[in-house]
A protein has these predicted regions:
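Active-site-proximal beta-alpha core segment in soluble small-molecule metabolic enzymes
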Residues: 2-3, 7-10, 17-18, 31-203
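Active-site anion/phosphate-binding pocket segments in diverse small-molecule metabolic enzymes
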Residues: 2-13, 17, 67-68, 87-89, ...
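Conserved PLP-enzyme active-site core in the AAT-like
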Residues: 26
């Protein structure tokens, strides 16, 4: 590792592919996988992740917005791309020309897309999003009152609805009745639409990471793992999957300092040394993505031993207690999370979820890929 690099993440594309194949091995015949690559592939680097998934045989990926999809197409990613977030309808021609599939969750949005495509000779592939209980976006299917709107969307000449999907609120809880209710609403709505219109949705999908593990009956035609793909479980249930964390965060000790009993550390003087202490300064802070809410709660690994973080995490640095690890010197590498100290543990201590820690890794944290 270049010693000029202060803080970095190592991303194992080999482990990513291992996770893809491990999840794939649990899917029924004919069930496709869509790898969720939004938010720069949860901080892992969307281009490199998508390229590796494509090479491994993945048929679909999902991003949130047009810019994310355009970047992937420019990098040679040719597989199917689903845009989960709504785009401005006035770029409908660009969407169709880019060859992506757009999520459509309201009749107003469907009409606008169709209007901007009128007279172009283009059709935009789309997946209809159904709101079954997440409380966000999608055609409301709590009852049949919006059926006419969904049927109208299916009839629009410039939209080609190849798929239909929904999103679960609590699928990481096994046997949850609310997830069962959402699934029932989803299937009922599809059945009503197909019977009334004669339209057949080629791809039905609803299983996010939690449902991949907990609800195999909900895998249907395609599953949408995000966190699982990167080797992190959304909850304690693993479903027997042998996954490997693809990302590890490291920082190099910049200085070792000595402090006396009663000395205070960092902003706000929230930590007082209970005895003479030896601290290691790590050049990683909340500007890099190390959440300030982890202040005084997390550990790092140095020489295979845990060193507690003390005082408030600063913008560009933090301090850890190495009093009991006398061998620590400037230049030593600290593991902040990885295979031996999970991102899930750090997230729990910070009072958040692994998604936030992974996505928080800023651009100044160099990505080092292991291929």
């Amino acid at each position: 590792m270049n010693r000029k690099i202060r803080t970095w993440v190592e991303i194992s594309l080999n482990d990513l592919e291992h996770n893809y194949r491990e999840i794939s091995s649990r899917l029924p015949d004919g069930c496709q996988m869509l790898g969720v690559c939004k938010a720069n592939a949860y901080g892992h680097g969307a281009v490199r992740v998508a390229q590796r998934l494509q090479r491994a045989g993945c048929q679909w990926i999902a991003v949130n917005c047009y810019d994310e999809a355009e970047e992937l197409r420019a990098a040679g990613v040719t597989m199917n791309i689903l845009l989960l977030g709504p785009q401005s309808a006035n770029i409908a021609v660009d969407l169709a020309s880019l060859g992506v599939t757009q999520a459509v969750g309201s009749i107003e949005y469907a009409r606008e897309l169709n209007r901007f495509l009128a007279g172009t000779g283009l059709r935009l592939n789309a997946h209809m999003k159904l709101e079954t209980g997440m409380g966000r976006t999608g055609f409301d299917v709590h009852d049949d009152s919006h059926l006419d709107e969904m049927l109208e969307a299916l009839s629009l000449p410039h939209l080609n609805f190849t798929g239909v999907f929904t999103h679960f609120a609590v699928s990481d809880e096994n046997g949850d009745p609310y997830t069962q209710l959402q699934f029932s609403r989803f299937l009922h709505a599809i059945d009503r639409m197909e019977q009334a219109s004669g339209h057949h949705f080629a791809i039905r999908h609803c299983a996010n990471s939690g449902a991949v593990i907990n609800y195999p009956e909900m895998h249907l035609d395609m599953v949408r793992p995000g966190l699982l793909l990167y080797g992190v479980f959304p909850a304690k249930e693993t479903g027997g999957l042998d996954l490997r964390p693809a990302m590890s965060l490291y920082s190099r000790v910049s200085e070792v300092t000595h402090h006396h009993t009663g000395d205070t550390i960092s902003y706000g003087r929230t930590f007082t040394c209970p005895h003479d202490m030896r601290l290691a300064v790590l050049p990683v802070g909340y500007a890099d993505g190390l959440l300030r809410s982890l202040s005084g709660k997390g550990d790092v690994l140095l020489h295979g031993k845990r060193a507690p973080q003390v005082g408030r995490i600063c913008m560009d640095m933090c301090m850890v207690d190495v009093t009991d690890i006398p061998e620590v010197q400037p230049g030593d590498v600290a593991t902040i999370f990885g295979a031996d100290l999970s991102v899930a543990e750090q997230a729990e201590k910070a009072g958040t979820i692994p998604y936030e820690l992974l996505c928080a890794m800023s651009q100044r944290v160099q990505r080092v890929y292991i291929d």
